[in-house]
């Protein structure tokens, strides 16, 4: 179905925002057609039209303090969502400049595909839906308070072999370079689990990770991993404990 941009917003994007707890009719949460003041073209002293020197963001999501958390640029369903990428980026930087606030997070979507961009920290990535207000505020808190990973201490009491330290350091440096995907190939007996735990420990201490999913393909490996996390990161709550089947959202591992 060929929807216009207005139909795409009303029929799809508004509903997706509602699923994440955003009320597009509440101006304390969402502002549509957010007015962004921009400089006039060089040599133009006065605006020739009421809209010259203005940009209008399709949506701006607000934090509980009323400041912009995120910008959403919408395109109609039959257009490539990526066509809104640079436009959304420009809006984010102009809002930051206009308000003197933190740089908003960036979204661009056609209703069928949505991309999230933490502009100065990671490349855009495809997501399913929009984060809640609490999620975005948590992302902003992490971004504001995390420490550089290049100098982060690696606990050699967890993984102290030279090749383990090199592997962890390589991943930490890659994250600082805005990379998102890493593959470590390690033979049996080389300390894969302890290498992962030391990496998780460094990421959590630096404020780059709040929760970690450690995925295994056999129950026996799950028990081994749980025991290892209990030994080397005893203060971090883990799931599952004995007999637990329902996922507990208050655990960090």
Task: List where the protein language model places each region.
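ATP-dependent helicase/translocase motor core
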Residues: 1-211, 216-236, 249-253
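Short acidic low-complexity segments
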Residues: 241-249
């Amino acid at each position: 179905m060929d929807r216009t941009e207005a139909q795409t917003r009303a029929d799809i994007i508004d509903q997706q925002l509602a699923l994440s707890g955003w009320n597009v009719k509440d101006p304390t949460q969402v502002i549509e057609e957010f007015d962004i003041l921009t400089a006039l073209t060089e040599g133009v002293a006065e605006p020739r039209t009421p809209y010259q020197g203005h940009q209008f963001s399709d949506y701006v999501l607000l934090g509980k303090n009323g400041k912009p958390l995120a910008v959403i640029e919408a395109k109609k369903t039959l257009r490539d969502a990526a066509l809104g990428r640079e436009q959304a980026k420009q809006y984010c930087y102009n809002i930051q400049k206009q308000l003197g606030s933190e740089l908003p997070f960036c979204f661009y979507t056609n209703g069928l595909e949505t991309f999230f961009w933490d502009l100065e920290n990671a490349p855009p990535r495809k997501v399913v839906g929009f984060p809640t207000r609490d999620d975005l505020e948590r992302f902003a808190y992490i971004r504001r308070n995390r420490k550089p990973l290049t100098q982060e201490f690696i606990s050699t009491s967890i993984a102290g072999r030279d090749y383990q330290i090199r592997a962890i350091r390589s991943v930490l440096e890659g994250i600082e370079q805005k990379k998102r995907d890493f593959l470590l190939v390690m033979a049996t007996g080389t300390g894969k689990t302890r290498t992962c735990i030391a990496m998780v420990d460094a990421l959590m201490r630096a404020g780059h990770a709040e929760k970690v999913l450690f995925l295994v393909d056999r129950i026996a490996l799950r028990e081994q991993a749980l025991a290892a996390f209990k030994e080397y990161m005893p203060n971090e709550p883990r799931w599952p404990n004995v007999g637990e089947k329902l996922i507990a959202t208050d655990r960090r591992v």
